[in-house]
Amino acid sequence: MKTLILIGGATACGKSTLAKNLCRYIPNSIKYRRYQGFFDIALQKNIPKNEVFQKISSVEVDDWFVNVCNNSEVVISDVHYAVQMNRNEMNTNVNIYQNYVSTISDDLLKKISLKNIRIIAIFLSCSPLQCFTRAISRYSENQKNIRNISVEDATIENLAEEKEWNDILDTGLVDGVKLDSEYFSVGQLTDQCLKYLNNNETRKLIRIKTDE
């Protein structure tokens, strides 16, 4: 069954690391972010990079992403379930209390579901202090941008991410599982994901047979 696996959570919770490792263990899987659609569409249409967000709509990107999922056996996508608009790196002048918005719309989920693609949303749970500590360490090692300016900032982000993840599950179009990335290694998390995916697929097959 074609599958989209979303792996989300707060900054530095381990999303990309788990996505990369899962891709190694799931046959015929690819890593692809919806956001990449902006640039792939731009390349196809010869749109300059500085005009990407003016000339390409979110609906176009959604449709592109659905097409990627429909043409792939398994798509693994590390995501932020919630973001503060116009903020992607640390800025000490930013208002950390500004509203978060969902990155995964109901319309996108419906479009994917209509293609009979199974959607699994994983939430990586990690304490705000640990996430903030990891982000600072990551910046010190490779100068990679970080977005949180304090543990309070990381706490607000964590709560927003989990709220939007729960809202996605409430649509009834998505199955999901919450995993602890603070106390489990990437290898252990990978094993837990694979076990969940196998169990979920078995339940889906039983449900289909029951409905026939």
Q: Where do the model's predicted regions map?
A:
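Hydrophobic anchor at the beta1->P-loop junction of P-loop NTPases
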Residues: 7
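P-loop (Walker A) phosphate-binding loop of NTP-binding proteins
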Residues: 10
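Walker A/P-loop
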Residues: 16
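Switch/connector loops and helix/strand junctions flanking conserved nucleotide-binding motifs
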Residues: 84-87, 128-136, 188
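Glycine-rich phosphate-binding loop used to anchor ATP phosphates in small-molecule kinases
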Residues: 55-117
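Conserved substrate/cofactor phosphate-moiety recognition/catalytic segment
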Residues: 19-70
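ATP-binding Walker
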Residues: 13
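Small-molecule kinase domains that catalyze NTP-dependent phosphoryl transfer to phosphate-bearing small molecules
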Residues: 137-192, 203-212
